[in-house]
């Protein structure tokens, strides 16, 4: 019975992650439609931030293309 107390927080975390995943997918698709790509925290060299994909991902666009 004690394992239920240990599993309950993990189940809540999984449910919370699943609830916000559809919103992140929409932002990612919007970034890709604008000829951008998602990167973790910062854009690589020769690209600029043009929006956000999720909490820790930014939408980047290359300067050369």
Swiss-Prot record:
Protein name: Antimicrobial peptide THP1
Pfam families listed in its UniProt record: Defensin_beta (PF00711)
Family: Belongs to the beta-defensin family.
Keyword Signal tagged: yes
Cystine pairs: 31-53, 38-59, 43-60
Major localisation: secreted
Keywords on record: Antibiotic, Antimicrobial, Defensin, Disulfide bond, Secreted, Signal
Function field: Bactericidal activity; inhibits S.aureus and E.coli.
């Amino acid at each position: 019975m004690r394992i239920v107390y240990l599993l309950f927080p993990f189940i809540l975390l999984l449910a919370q992650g699943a609830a916000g995943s559809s919103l992140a997918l929409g932002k990612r698709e919007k970034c890709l439609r604008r000829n951008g790509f998602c990167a973790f925290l910062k854009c690589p060299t020769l690209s600029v931030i043009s929006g956000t994909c999720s909490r820790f991902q930014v939408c980047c666009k290359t300067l050369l293309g």
